[in-house]
Structure formats: C-alpha cells, structure tokens
C-alpha cells in the first residue's frame, strides 16, 4: 500500500506496466505551451513524476535525472507534476536547469488519472519513474510505495542505457 507523509493513499486509475504502450498526454510547459508524447517522437523518454517541485526529494530527483541523462543521445527527461507552470519555470531558473523539460498536469489532472498516479486524498501525483523506448513502449517502471522516498536512480538510468 502506498503512503504519503506516513498515511495510506489511494489513486485514480490503473498504473501502467512494462510492455504497455504509454498513453498520450496533453500537458503545459512553463512557457504555457501544450506538449504531448508525440512532441518527443523518436526519442527515449524518462518520465520523472513527482508530487511537487517545491519539496526536497522532488528537487533532488529532478536535478539528478536532468544532470545525469542530459548528455545521452536521443533521450529526454520529462518531469511531470501538478505544480503551476510558473512555479516550475521559477524553479528551473533558480537551479540553472534551463534545458529541463517541465510539464504540468495542474489543469485537469488527465495525466495523473490516465497513468494511475493521481493521489485522491491530495490531488498530487505519486512519485514514479517510467522509461519509454522511442516507440513509447514502457521498458521500466518504479512506483514508490513510500512517496516520500527517492527512486532507484541507478536502475532507471541503466534501463535507459540498455535501450542503446
């Protein structure tokens, strides 16, 4: 059972599994542009899903994946939260991560519902990492039972590297 701040939580929707094709989405960037999965066609994708960029672990996760994977060819890190796009942009500017791709699900939580990550009790996204190949097939997933803990960075990074 997943917990957030030590309390059990429930989710809307079903979590995706390895072998499935990732659902398309429409999310908002800090520049208020809509982005979908199709905008990253032909690239390997790391979906780094966090509750809020304004927390220590979420900031650490976002920095780690962006700094570690930014040099890999044909690979993008997509950080998804329900933070307002303005907050995401402000965080990136403060951290000097100008090339980080931040996507907000604040508007209708459609991403959280489709991916089974919307926490019913808080209307935040659960912490998760999904790796997609260039055809959007899910090759790695980590759903954290303790949403207040860090993901297994090494396993996710290795999952990207084995895609070539």
Curated annotation (Swiss-Prot):
Q: Which CDD domains match?
A: PRX_Atyp2cys (cd03014)
Catalyses:
a hydroperoxide + [thioredoxin]-dithiol = an alcohol + [thioredoxin]-disulfide + H2O
EC no. given is 1.11.1.24
Per its UniProt entry, which superkingdom is the organism in? Bacteria
Specify whether Disulfide bond is a keyword of the entry.
yes
Report whether Oxidoreductase shows up as a keyword of the record.
yes
Write out the catalytic residues in the record.
Answer: 58 (cysteine sulfenic acid (-soh) intermediate)
Q: What is this protein called?
A: Thiol peroxidase
Which gene name belongs to this protein? tpx
């Amino acid at each position: 059972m997943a917990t957030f701040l030590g309390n059990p939580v429930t989710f809307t929707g079903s979590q995706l599994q390895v072998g499935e094709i990732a659902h398309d989405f429409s999310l908002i960037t800090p520049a208020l542009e809509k982005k979908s999965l199709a905008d990253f066609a032909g690239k390997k994708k790391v979906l780094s899903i966090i509750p809020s960029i304004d927390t220590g672990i979420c900031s650490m996760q976002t920095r780690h994946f962006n700094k570690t994977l930014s040099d890999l060819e044909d690979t993008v890190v997509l950080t998804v939260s329900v933070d307002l796009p303005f907050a995401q942009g402000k965080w990136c500017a403060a951290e000097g991560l100008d090339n980080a791709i931040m996507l907000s699900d604040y508007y209708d939580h459609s991403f959280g519902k489709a991916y089974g990550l919307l926490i019913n009790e808080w209307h935040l996204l659960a912490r998760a990492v999904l790796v997609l190949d260039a055809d959007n097939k899910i090759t790695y997933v980590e759903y954290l039972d303790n949403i207040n803990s860090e993901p297994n960075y090494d396993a996710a990074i290795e999952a990207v590297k084995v895609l070539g």
